[in-house]
Structure formats: C-alpha cells, structure tokens
Amino acid sequence: MSKFKVGDIIKARPGWLGPGETGEERYLVLEDRGNKTLVQYIDVDHIFSFGSTHVYADEWMELDPNPSNEVLMTVTDMANGKI
C-alpha cells in the first residue's frame, strides 16, 4: 500500500531514472494503485511565485520505492493557505 493519497503533492524520484541519475520532481497524485501511481507533473515553484502552474499530461509512473519520496502538501493544505 502506498503512502500517497489522491490530491497529495509529492516529491518523488521517477522509477525510470537510471542508477546514479538524480532528479526528484514534484507531482500531483491523481490515482494510486500501490505499485503504480497516476501523477501529473507540476512546477510547484511556479505556484508559489505566480499562483498558477504549468500543466503537463498525466501519466502512470512507477515511483522509485525510495525513502526520500515524500508528501510535500495536500490540495487541502493549499486551499487553506498552508503553503
């Protein structure tokens, strides 16, 4: 079972990155099935700076089961101004 919930904004390392490659990105969780998560890449810095975000196509990703994957905030947190 995944620790992510629908609506979470997460920092995660995509599973397709090769050994030695770095690159944690921020994603909005759209659906979670444990081993695969439907996410939408977002530019969180853009939200903080301009109040909006770039939207990219959603995709199923196998997130690296890396302990550094973490929930940054939830959509509810954002709506309540806790960003």
Region spans (language model):
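Short beta-strand-centered aromatic/proline hotspots
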Residues: 20-32
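Short aromatic-glycine-enriched beta-strand elements
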Residues: 36-38
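Intrinsically disordered, low-complexity, charged/polar segments
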Residues: 40-83
